[in-house]
């Protein structure tokens, strides 16, 4: 069945030409098409030339967005002993040991990011079926399994994001709020591009970036010229 497109979205789509836009032009258009009645996120949707069913073609990493996410991030920490106190002092919103694991098993999910120290991971592993589908399962690659809980808390609250390519090789990631200036969005988008290039899977062959779109949460997709973004010097946006 064909999905009905709203009149609002049709009008916004009419503003977007079928071509690749330069980075700043694309982000200016993203802001222009963010007309929903709530604070929309700025999103990137990137199809990469990888097949994640092969282990050497998987992408899972983190990016530190210099201008932040524009969101308040609630961080939970599962640890033991002095690390519980360290996490509390570092500003974690939820902290606990085995009792927090039990609460999560019973359905507690009032956090956006879960950090665990390596010594509790055998117990945290039993939460996989609950946390995995929500993208909350701690992992070393995601920077969420660490004894340095204070640094991890600070980084995620400041704008560090974990992302991965899905089973079709597409990365969906939020890189700020549509209310940010185009220049601030560009700083974050450049950080994302550099992170994806730096973490290119060893098994990736041929053209790495296949298609690259940005959009507001409820807005139309806007195609971005990846080569122009790669070549962009951030001083040009100043």
Curated annotation (Swiss-Prot):
Any one GO molecular function term: rRNA binding
Matching entries from PROSITE patterns are given as:
RIBOSOMAL_L1
Listed GO cellular component terms?
large ribosomal subunit
Which parts of the chain are coiled coil?
none
Q: Which InterPro entries match?
A: Ribosom_uL1_bac-type, Ribosomal_uL1, Ribosomal_uL1-like, Ribosomal_uL1/biogenesis, Ribosomal_uL1_3-a/b-sand, Ribosomal_uL1_CS
Question: Which Pfam families does the entry link to?
Answer: Ribosomal_L1
- Keyword terms of this UniProt record: Repressor, Ribonucleoprotein, Ribosomal protein, RNA-binding, rRNA-binding, Translation regulation, tRNA-binding
Superkingdom, according to UniProt?
Bacteria
**In Gene Ontology terms, what is a biological process of this protein?**
regulation of translation
Q: What does this protein do?
A: Binds directly to 23S rRNA. The L1 stalk is quite mobile in the ribosome, and is involved in E site tRNA release. Protein L1 is also a translational repressor protein, it controls the translation of the L11 operon by binding to its mRNA.
The UniProt entry, under PANTHER family, shows:
54S RIBOSOMAL PROTEIN L1, MITOCHONDRIAL, LARGE RIBOSOMAL SUBUNIT PROTEIN UL1M
Q: How does it assemble?
A: Part of the 50S ribosomal subunit.
Q: What family is this? A: Belongs to the universal ribosomal protein uL1 family.
Protein's name according to its UniProt entry: Large ribosomal subunit protein uL1
**Which source organism?**
Nostoc sp. (strain PCC 7120 / SAG 25.82 / UTEX 2576)
């Amino acid at each position: 069945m064909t999905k009905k497109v709203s009149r609002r979205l049709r009008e916004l789509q009419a503003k977007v030409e079928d071509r690749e836009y330069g980075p700043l032009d694309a982000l200016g258009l993203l802001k222009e098409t963010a007309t929903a009645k709530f604070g929309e996120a700025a999103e990137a949707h990137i199809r990469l030339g990888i097949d994640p069913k092969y282990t050497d073609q998987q992408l899972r990493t983190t990016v530190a967005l210099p201008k932040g996410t524009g969101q308040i991030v609630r961080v939970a920490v599962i640890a033991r002993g002095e690390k519980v106190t360290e996490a509390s002092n570092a500003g974690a919103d939820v902290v606990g040991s085995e009792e927090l694991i039990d609460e999560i098993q019973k359905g507690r999910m009032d956090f956006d990011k879960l950090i665990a120290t390596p010594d509790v991971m055998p117990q945290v592993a039993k939460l996989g079926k609950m946390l995995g589908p929500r993208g909350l399962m701690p992992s070393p690659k995601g920077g969420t399994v660490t004894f340095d809980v204070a640094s991890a808390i600070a980084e995620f609250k400041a704008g560090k994001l974990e992302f991965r390519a899905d089973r079709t090789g597409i990365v969906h990631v939020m890189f700020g709020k549509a209310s940010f200036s185009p220049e601030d969005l560009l700083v974050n988008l450049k950080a994302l591009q550099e992170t994806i290039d730096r973490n290119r899977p060893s098994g990736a062959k041929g053209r790495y970036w296949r298609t690259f779109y940005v959009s507001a949460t409820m807005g139309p997709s806007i195609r971005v010229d990846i080569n122009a973004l790669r070549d962009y010097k951030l001083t040009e946006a100043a």
